[in-house]
Regions:
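Flavin-dependent oxidoreductase catalytic cores
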Residues: 1-363
């Protein structure tokens, strides 16, 4: 029997933004950017179709050429990229929606063919991740990284600040820092990938330093209520920590002190076991005064229960939004859901992107 889903459709105040419902479209890499890593016109259509979500969070957008890890992902560091993202934000706003951009640096999860001058990807340490990237020929092993030199870190922080400034120029309503899923900031935080012996390695405080400094960099540009961050305590992309509870308790405490608008928490393994790591997510939520977005395999009923019980403020959905642009209305009516076509998740054109039918188009 279906639970009372009324909690899904209550408005929520996020900073100075009022969200009309508690559904968040999670950031979803779709690998459809055009030459120059700019968002295409069909991307404006794609996000505009989904504007009924309480909040849209864009696909990860690299803050620099070095920050790219997959083929045809959009950037937010060039004037052309800013101009094309403006078409997306205009489409979302015209449809009555709200959209944040996700700022992304992949770190070691990349390939030399995607890096400036064919160079090695960068990470906290010269440790190759046992994971894949997406190239012209399909999925391939990531390349051997090099360790970032201490002298390079200020440049990374400037890239975050510049990307935040560009996001404002592109018309976004706010931004989310991608500090999850085994990418650069997550690599620095977790001791499985960070073997440094300087101010950015060793202790939990040191390993968390880059994440906190990147957050402070974007807060130079944006009001704190318009900034969120995504975290993933579990192992992702071969990036794990020996004591995630202690690590993320510290990280959340530091982020709370900065007054961020929200934490977007991937609870358990991404698209996998929700109990993949022994972490007290409710405890983390309780130590943060901003909003909490729960993510990972939530159904309509699970989300309604979590919201009704007060365990979360908002719930993010990924694949359900891929296949159901009108997910909010489908949840409201408890209507059948379209099934996502996994074959079209990464790369391609309109098929599996903007051609999923709405309820009024269903046969």
């Amino acid at each position: 029997m279906s639970v009372d889903a009324n909690a899904l459709f209550q408005p929520f105040k996020l900073g100075d933004l009022t969200l009309p419902n508690r559904l968040v479209m999670a950031p979803l890499t779709r690998n459809r950017a055009a030459e120059g890593d700019v968002a295409r016109d069909i991307t404006a259509t794609y996000y505009g179709q989904r504007a009924s979500a309480g909040l849209l969070i864009s696909e990860g957008s690299q803050i620099s050429h070095q920050g790219q890890g997959y083929l045809r992902t959009p950037g937010i560091y060039s004037p052309a990229q800013v101009a094309h993202w403006r078409k997306v934000t205009d489409a979302v706003h015209k449809a009555g929606g709200r959209i944040f951009i996700q700022l992304w640096h992949v770190g070691r999860v990349s390939h030399t063919s995607l890096q400036p001058g064919g160079g090695a990807p960068v990470g906290p340490s010269a440790l190759r991740a046992q994971t894949k990237t997406f190239l012209e020929e399909g999925f391939a092993d990531v390349s051997e990284p090099r360790a970032l030199d201490l002298s390079e870190i200020p440049g990374i922080l400037r890239d975050y600040e510049n990307a935040a400034r560009n996001a404002k120029e592109a018309g976004f309503d706010g931004l989310e820092i991608h500090a999850a899923n085994g990418y650069l900031l997550d690599q620095f935080m977790k001791d499985g990938s960070n073997h440094r012996a300087d101010a950015y390695g060793g202790s939990i405080e040191n390993r968390a330093r880059l994440t906190i400094e990147a957050t402070e960099a974007v807060l130079k540009i944006w009001d704190k209520g318009r900034v969120g961050i995504r975290l993933s305590p579990a192992k992702v992309n071969d990036t794990a920590d020996s004591n995630p509870q202690a690590l993320f308790s510290h990280v959340v405490e530091k982020l709370d002190g900065l007054g961020l608008g929200y934490i977007h928490m991937i609870e358990g393994a991404t698209q996998g076991d929700r109990n993949a790591v022994d972490v007290d997510y409710e405890g983390l939520r309780g130590s943060f005064r901003g909003a909490y977005i729960a993510n990972n395999g939530y159904s309509r009923d699970m989300a309604a229960e979590a919201l009704s019980s007060g365990r979360t403020d908002l719930v993010a959905f990924g694949r359900l939004f891929i296949a159901n642009p009108d997910l909010v209305e489908r949840f409201r009516l408890n209507a059948p859901l379209n099934e996502p076509d996994r074959a079209t998740f990464y790369g391609g054109g309109v098929k599996g992107y903007t051609d999923y039918p709405g309820l009024d188009e269903a046969a």
